[in-house]
């Protein structure tokens, strides 16, 4: 009887488990059929069998439970079924590089899921509970999706086994979560969040993290990067194109660091020796910051991108700084190297235009840093500048004590440290030194008394004991009366002072504008250097009848000696009479015309000081729909864009109905002139090395536009006539952002000016949909033109060859037989050159893929072209050739005040996987660095 009962119990349990297993497998069947319906794959896809476990790219267990869905790179469209969350045994969901749209369904509860790959699709939203209950999750890749703005959810905390989190170009907003540190994710090694909308500072909770690859570039992140010095596992750090500031940290603990990209930030101070001595370092990019001190010297094995002129080094080549510069930098170090000082304190002579510095016969006599929002302490290094007569540090946020070393200055007359947060005893200065410490409540008190719980009142008296209590009681009523009387008098005095200030301000404005230009004046706004309301610091070296200024002159108080005065001019907008502008263009003479286009005519001009400019006279129809304020707002955005491969917009001119843009002058004209009209113009044909370099220049400029953290631009009309060359035969992209100035609505001429047939991406021409991939397509056409020497549309050719892109792809399919005939006959084809041309041709084919998602980003193009420019060098270089390019040369700095430089991001890559191609041609262009996830695209890391 007992045996029978046991047998029945066993049989019941077995049948129950069998039925549950059957129910689970039926649930998987239902979920997979829903997935098939929502994706609607073609019949050739291999999903026709009624059993999903027999479908291609699907892996199941022996009990028919689905564990893997691996359908990446399949060209699938449609949406994802919410029934996916029922696949409770699913371990890998790989859907990358498709065209799937709609929301990402909730995956909460998929406790077995280890890998989630959704990159490079068109998903538009992601639920907040997407990671809820995913306790086995190890890798997340959701890059390059047009999600609605979202923040990394708290539910990610459940995935404590996470090793890789990649969400580049995924519209992530908010701040970087503090829970991404080692306490929650001890195994996290890849953290990629490039090109999103993250703000705030790096959380200190990242300290101790073993992350090896950190991509946070292209955001709005601020603050310092001190936390990096405690992330000792780092191998790759890309923080470029943010708003980081402060000095670089100590890198001595980062023994495995190989690649460091910090370009396009506001870092200050010297490059630390700990970075220079790293044995593991291979690539470093520090261009376009405010780094100071001597030019750093890295090991010969390190690929360095460090444009000397885009930082604030004392010299243009390695060498010791002037002793005066060394002392001033040590002083700045106590203030944590303020950006405002770093922007001004450039070069090796502090007596030439350094903000707050005045000299006599080459000796520093005055340091005036009042109202500079300084923090930190007063450096003892002030005492090393023996010629100092005045030190003005008032109205800042300085702490600490006044250094004893200042008393040793033999020529010191004035020390003003008023309105700070200093404490401690004031050192004994000579009797003839005027010391102003007003506005420091704790001056005269030592630090121990300030930190004591029973510290004295601000007056300094302890008042302890019985007598003290009695004194306080006796003083109470008189003090109360004094407070009332003082308040009344103080109020009356305040009203009087305010009235006086308003009167002075009014009189000053009358005086300031009484001699200004009439309504005919043209305002040329200088390049933006910071806040919209911030004036530009200029130094007046002379005067001119053609250039006036609105200025205030400030003289340091307390002296009548001329040599002791510091004069600084606050200049707002430069005023240039319209007669001057007309004069330099011969009244907009046709002889001065450089070219014309959809936006208007461009004239050449030369200012009185020899500076050449290009004046674009906008067509009335282009901007008729724009109000003054709107036009000014649009231009204000454009003037913030600074890059060495973008034509500098110096300012805008307004005079009645006329609206003019003032650009830097590019003497060698358009790329079109050198590529298609060289023979008629009497020019030399472009060498292949020149074409490569020009292509790289354009790619870098457009990459910068696409990656702007504060305002993303799409050019929409990229073509050779919008690419201008300087005397050094380096390229700059012109007319970027001008489509924004065109009026909107059906009457807009945007369709005429926002693109040129032959360069238009198919989706833009058909639907008007604009993404950065529109520019990528145009760039691919330009690459084809550089290779063939033919125009994008050439009606002189046979009908089947008129359209360059179609003809080029047909020719390239048969590389050996026909493609060599398609190459420009002026290019000298040796073996190395031909290999280089083939690589660029492959890149051009990718860029001109029909579907936008199949095209790479501009960062990918930069990677490919920069490797060719660096590694492929023709053996026969003619030093007498005026068109020869020294790849190491600096670009000319005709307009330094408004230009900044972008550097290379030659971060190492090697071939691993291939982009899909419409013509099924075998490709050899590397699409991701070795060892990185399959969903990698180079935009993620630039």
UniProtKB/Swiss-Prot annotation:
* Residues annotated as signal peptide: 1-23
Instruction: Describe PTMs of this protein.
Output: Autophosphorylated on serine and threonine residues. Glycosylated.
Q: In which tissues is it expressed?
A: Expressed in roots, leaves, stems, siliques and flowers.
Q: Which residues lie on this side of the membrane: Extracellular?
A: 24-482
Principal place of residence: membrane
Please describe what this protein does. Answer: Transmembrane kinase receptor. Phosphorylates only serine and threonine residues. Involved in auxin signal transduction and cell expansion and proliferation regulation. Forms with ABP1 a cell surface auxin perception complex that activates ROP signaling pathways. Required for auxin promotion of pavement cell interdigitation. Auxin promotes the formation of the ABP1-TMK1 protein complex. Promotes auxin-triggered phosphorylation status modulation of RAF-like kinases (e.g. RAF20 and RAF24).
What molecular function terms (GO) are annotated for this protein? ATP binding; protein serine kinase activity; transmembrane receptor protein serine/threonine kinase activity
Q: Which EC main class describes this enzyme?
A: transferase
Please state what the protein is called.
Receptor protein kinase TMK1
Checking Pfam families in the record gives: LRR_1, LRR_8, LRRNT_2, Pkinase
Q: Which organism is it from?
A: Arabidopsis thaliana (Mouse-ear cress)
Which GO biological process entries does UniProt record here? regulation of auxin mediated signaling pathway; signal transduction
């Amino acid at each position: 009887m007992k045996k029978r009962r046991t047998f029945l119990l066993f049989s019941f349990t077995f049948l129950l488990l069998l039925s549950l297993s059957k129910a689970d497998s039926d649930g998987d069947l239902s979920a997979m059929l829903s997935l098939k319906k929502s994706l609607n794959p073609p019949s050739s896809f291999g999903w026709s069998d009624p059993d999903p476990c027999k479908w291609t790219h699907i892996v199941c267990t022996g009990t028919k439970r689905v564990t893997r869905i691996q359908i990446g790179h399949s060209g699938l469209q449609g949406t994802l079924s919410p029934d996916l969350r029922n696949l409770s045994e699913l371990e890998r969901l790989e859907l990358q590089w498709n065209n799937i749209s709609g929301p990402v369904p909730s995956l909460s509860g998929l406790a077995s899921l280890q890998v989630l790959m959704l990159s490079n699709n068109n998903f538009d939203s992601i639920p907040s509970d997407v990671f809820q209950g995913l306790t086995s999750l190890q890798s997340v890749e959701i890059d390059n999706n047009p999600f609605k703005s979202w923040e990394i959810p708290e539910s990610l905390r459940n995935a404590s086994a996470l090793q890789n989190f990649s969400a580049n170009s995924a519209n992530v907003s908010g701040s970087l979560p503090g829970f991404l540190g080692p306490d929650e994710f001890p195994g996290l090694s890849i953290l990629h969040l490039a090109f999103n909308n993250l703000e705030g500072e790096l959380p200190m909770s990242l300290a101790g993290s073993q992350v090896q690859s950190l991509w946070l570039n292209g955001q709005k992140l601020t603050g310092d990067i001190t936390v990096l010095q405690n992330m000792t596992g780092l191998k790759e750090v890309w923080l470029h194109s943010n708003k980081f500031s402060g000095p670089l940290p100590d890198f001595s603990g980062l023994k495995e660091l190989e690649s460091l990209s910090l370009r396009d930030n506001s870092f200050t101070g010297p490059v630390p020796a700990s970075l220079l001595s790293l044995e593991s370092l291979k690539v470093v990019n520090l261009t376009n910051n405010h780094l100071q001190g001597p030019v750093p010297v890295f090991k010969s094995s390190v690929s360095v991108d460090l444009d000397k002129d885009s930082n604030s080094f004392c010299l243009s080549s390695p060498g010791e700084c002037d002793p005066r510069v060394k002392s001033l930098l040590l002083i700045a170090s106590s203030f944590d190297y303020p950006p405002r000082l770093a922007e001004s304190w450039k070069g090796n002579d502090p007596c030439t235009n350094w903000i707050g510095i005045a000299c006599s016969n080459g000796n520093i006599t005055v340091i005036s840093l009042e109202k500079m929002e300084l923090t930190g302490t007063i450096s003892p290094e002030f005492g090393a500048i023996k010629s100092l007569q005045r030190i003005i540090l008032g109205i800042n946020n300085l702490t600490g004590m006044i250094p004893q070393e200042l008393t040793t200055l033999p020529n010191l007359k004035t020390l003003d440290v008023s309105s700070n947060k200093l404490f401690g005893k004031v050192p004994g200065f000579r009797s003839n030194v005027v010391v102003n410490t007003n506005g420091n409540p704790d001056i005269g008190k030592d630090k121990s008394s300030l930190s004591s719980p029973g510290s004295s009142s601000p007056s300094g008296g302890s008042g302890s004991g019985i007598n003290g209590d009695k004194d306080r009681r006796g003083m109470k009523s008189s003090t109360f009366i004094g407070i009332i009387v003082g308040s009344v008098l103080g109020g009356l005095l305040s009203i009087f002072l305010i009235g006086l200030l308003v009167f002075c301000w009014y009189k000053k404005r009358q005086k300031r504008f009484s001699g200004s230009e009439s309504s005919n004046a043209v305002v040329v706004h200088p390049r933006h250097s910071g806040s919209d309301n911030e004036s530009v610091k200029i130094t007046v070296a002379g005067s001119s009848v053609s250039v006036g200024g609105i200025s205030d002159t400030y003289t340091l108080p307390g002296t009548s000696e001329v040599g002791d005065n510091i004069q600084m001019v606050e200049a707002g907008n430069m005023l240039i009479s319209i007669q001057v502008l007309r004069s330099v263009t011969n009244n907009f003479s046709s002889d001065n015309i450089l070219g014309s286009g959809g936006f208007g005519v461009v004239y050449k001009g030369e200012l009185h000081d020899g500076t050449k400019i290009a004046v674009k006279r906008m067509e009335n129809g282009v901007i008729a729909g724009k109000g003054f304020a709107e036009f000014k707002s649009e231009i204000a955005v454009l003037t913030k864009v600074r890059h060495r491969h973008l034509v500098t917009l110096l300012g805008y001119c307004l005079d009645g109905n006329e609206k003019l843009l003032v650009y830097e002058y590019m003497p060698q004209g358009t790329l079109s002139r050198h590529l298609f009209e060289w023979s008629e113009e009497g020019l030399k044909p472009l060498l292949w090395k020149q074409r490569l370099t020009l292509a790289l220049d354009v790619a870098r400029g457009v990459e910068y536009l696409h990656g702007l953290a504060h305002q993303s631009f799409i050019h929409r009309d990229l073509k050779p006539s919008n690419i201008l060359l300087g005397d050094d035969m380096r390229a700059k992209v012109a007319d970027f952002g001008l489509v924004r100035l065109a009026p909107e609505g059906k009457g807009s001429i945007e369709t005429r000016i926002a693109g040129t047939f032959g360069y238009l991406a198919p989706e833009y021409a058909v639907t008007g949909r604009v993404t950065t991939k529109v520019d990528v397509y145009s760039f691919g056409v330009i690459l084809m033109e550089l290779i063939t020497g033919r125009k994008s549309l050439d009606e002189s050719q046979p009908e089947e060859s008129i359209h360059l892109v179609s003809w080029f792809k047909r020719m390239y399919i048969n590389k050996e037989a026909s493609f060599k005939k398609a190459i420009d006959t002026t290019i000298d084809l040796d073996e190395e050159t031909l290999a280089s041309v083939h690589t660029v041709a492959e890149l051009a084919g990718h860029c001109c893929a029909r579907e936008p998602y199949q095209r790479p980003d501009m960062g990918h193009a930069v990677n490919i072209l920069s490797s060719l420019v660096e590694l492929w060098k023709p053996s026969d270089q003619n030093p007498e050739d005026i068109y020869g390019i020294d790849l190491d040369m600096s670009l000319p700095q005709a307009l330094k005040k408004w230009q900044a430089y972008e550097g290379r991001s030659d971060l190492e890559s090697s071939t691993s996987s291939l982009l899909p191609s419409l013509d099924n041609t075998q490709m050899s262009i590397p699409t991701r660095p070795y060892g990185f996830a399959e969903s990698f695209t180079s935009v993620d890391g630039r």
